[in-house]
């Protein structure tokens, strides 16, 4: 009887070791859960960014307004007949 109890105790300790301490135990599970959460957050950010870029591409394909806006803001272009005024604020 003592042998069986001892054997069961050793078996219980071995299973507890695998659960808590081994590389495939709860520590690894927590690390994987953190990694998955971080990856999901990163994926959501990238999906949002892709939607913005897709809308911008669609706007550039379909209309001249976005193209004109980019030319004005990025290249400093003005329309014919317009006068450009630059306001400089004093420090």
Swiss-Prot record:
What subcellular locations does the record give? Cell inner membrane
* GO BP: FtsZ-dependent cytokinesis
Keyword vocabulary terms for this entry = Cell cycle, Cell division, Cell inner membrane, Cell membrane, Coiled coil, Membrane, Transmembrane, Transmembrane helix
Coiled-coil regions, chain positions: 26-74
Q: Does Phosphoprotein appear among the keywords?
A: no
A single cellular component GO annotation: cell division site
Give ranges for the Periplasmic compartment. Answer: 22-91
Q: Where are the transmembrane segments?
A: 4-21
Bilayer topology: Single-pass type II membrane protein
Tell me the superkingdom of the source.
Answer: Bacteria
Q: Which InterPro entries match?
A: Cell_div_FtsB, FtsL/DivIC
Ranges per topology, Cytoplasmic: 1-3
Q: What is its main location?
A: membrane
- Spell out the HAMAP family in the cross-references: FtsB
Subunit structure comment from the entry: Part of a complex composed of FtsB, FtsL and FtsQ.
Described by its record, this protein's role is as follows: Essential cell division protein. May link together the upstream cell division proteins, which are predominantly cytoplasmic, with the downstream cell division proteins, which are predominantly periplasmic.
Instruction: Give the protein family.
Output: Belongs to the FtsB family.
The cross-references to PANTHER family, in alphabetical order and at most eight, read:
CELL DIVISION PROTEIN FTSB
Q: What is this protein called?
A: Cell division protein FtsB
Species of the source:
Nitrosococcus oceani (strain ATCC 19707 / BCRC 17464 / JCM 30415 / NCIMB 11848 / C-107)
């Amino acid at each position: 009887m003592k042998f069986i109890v001892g054997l069961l105790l050793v078996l219980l300790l071995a299973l507890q070791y695998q659960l808590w301490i081994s590389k495939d135990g709860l520590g690894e599970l927590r690390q994987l859960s953190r990694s998955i959460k971080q990856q999901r957050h990163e994926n959501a950010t990238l999906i949002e960014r892709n939607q913005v870029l897709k809308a911008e591409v669609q706007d550039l394909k379909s209309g001249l307004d976005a193209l004109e806006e980019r030319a004005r803001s990025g290249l400093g272009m003005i329309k014919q007949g317009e006068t450009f005024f630059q306001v400089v604020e004093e420090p």
